[in-house]
Regions:
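Switch/communication elements of ASCE P-loop NTPase nucleotide-binding domains
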Residues: 1-36, 253-319
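P-loop NTPase switch/coupling surface
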Residues: 1-194
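Short flexible/disordered coil segments
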Residues: 41-52, 217-232, 309-313, 317
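Extended helical coiled-coil dimerization/tether regions that scaffold
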Residues: 88-90, 100, 131-274, 279-287
Length: 319
């Protein structure tokens, strides 16, 4: 699916809305894990989402979706009162976000969450169902929980959101880990959800590229992925980047054909803009994971020929 149009015509809003809804299943999993660890804390095991003590899974999800809405779309105060978003995962599973203006609520345009009966039944039936072992959440309980949840949503895809304005994040690559590590929880929450997810993903995956894309390609031989497909993806990546990416000694580099390299923060604007699109596409191709990619402005700062190549790479990975 492609969106084109004038600036401020709503393309990013639609992309963020898809991300918001398609990651709800992941939110439910993390909230269920947090609920279990809140009831039975385990030393050294930290939950990724904070949760109110003793709260039900349904209420925890409603609270989190309100917070997630604000961090994804901004304050609801300036939005029209009749604004709503509704996403149908199946004929019987949906989530609707709307605004309520009522004296019962302390703020104007209160964010109201409506869920389908099937989803509500699942949340009630699976309230406090994950058990905790001395090592953390029971793997078997979590496996069954995910299986049942994915059946409700008819969706097991992970979502990878690649926002616009990537070059600034790439430009600060050397300082990025330090900047993010020194931010407190409040500052991290001030980042919009999509950007935060993107930042954390690239910080987590950088070490995987210590041997460059060729190192990842080598591991693909053990996964049963077609060598022809890998070579084709590597060739397109080389044509777009005019080099290959490598993460070495805490430094991001573009390695040129003659073996010399350029630090990523001194590379061209086009390379900075596209490098992590290419890295993420190739990484998940090799991992053979079912991924929904949401990519904003993949053609940004690229020559028309390179725009053609990146379109071909996206199609190759998608198919």
């Amino acid at each position: 699916m492609n969106f084109t149009g004038f600036q401020a015509s709503g393309k990013s809003t639609i992309a963020k809305a898809i991300y918001y809804f398609r990651t709800i299943k992941d939110d439910i999993i993390e909230l269920a894990k947090s609920q279990a660890l809140d009831a039975t804390p385990v030393y050294g095991v930290k939950s990724t989402l904070s949760i109110e003590h003793g709260i039900t899974l349904r209420k925890a999800l409603e609270n989190y979706l309100r917070e997630k809405f604000l961090r994804t779309f901004g304050s609801s105060w300036g939005m029209p009162n009749d604004m709503y978003m509704e996403y149908h995962f199946t004929k019987t599973c949906y989530v609707k976000i709307s605004l309520e203006n009522d004296s019962r609520y302390s703020t104007p345009n209160y964010i109201w969450i409506t869920m389908s009966n099937e989803l509500i039944r699942f949340l009630k039936a699976n309230n406090h169902t994950l058990s905790v072992t001395p090592l953390g959440i029971s793997e078997e309980d979590l496996r069954i929980f995910k299986k049942n949840l994915y059946e409700i949503f008819e969706d097991s895809c992970s979502v990878v959101y690649i926002p616009a304005g990537r070059s600034m994040i790439t430009l600060l690559s050397q300082q990025l880990s330090y900047i993010y590590a020194t931010m407190d929880d409040m500052q991290k929450r001030s980042l919009d959800t999509c950007t935060k997810d993107y930042l954390e993903r690239i910080l987590r995956l950088k070490p995987e590229f210590s041997e460059g894309l060729q190192g990842l390609a080598y591991s693909s031989g053990r996964s049963g992925l077609s060598p022809r497909l890998v070579v084709q993806a590597l060739d397109l990546t080389q044509k777009i980047l005019r080099g290959t990416y490598r993460y070495s000694n805490g430094e991001e580099q573009i390695v040129l054909e003659d073996g010399k390299y350029v630090k990523i923060n001194f590379s061209s604007s086009g390379q900075q803009e596209c490098v992590w699109i290419l890295n993420l596409l190739f990484y998940y191709l090799v991992q053979q994971k079912e991924i929904l990619f949401i990519i904003e402005e993949p053609e940004s700062h690229l020559f028309p020929e390179s725009q053609k190549y990146i379109t071909e790479l996206i199609a190759l990975v998608n198919n």
